[in-house]
């Protein structure tokens, strides 16, 4: 589950500016 979210964040970090 975490890998899926990390992959999405790397592809579209704009979606999760939490980082």
Curated annotation (Swiss-Prot):
- The EC number(s) given in the record are 4.1.1.4
In alphabetical order, the GO MF annotations are:
acetoacetate decarboxylase activity
Q: Which UniProt keywords apply?
A: Decarboxylase, Lyase
Q: Does the keyword Ion transport apply?
A: no
Q: Which reaction(s) are listed as its catalytic activity?
A: acetoacetate + H(+) = acetone + CO2
What is the recorded function of this protein according to its Swiss-Prot or TrEMBL entry? Catalyzes the conversion of acetoacetate to acetone and carbon dioxide.
Name the record gives this protein? Acetoacetate decarboxylase
Q: Which organism is it from?
A: Clostridium pasteurianum
């Amino acid at each position: 589950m975490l890998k899926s979210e990390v992959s999405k964040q790397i592809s579209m970090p704009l979606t999760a500016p939490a980082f």
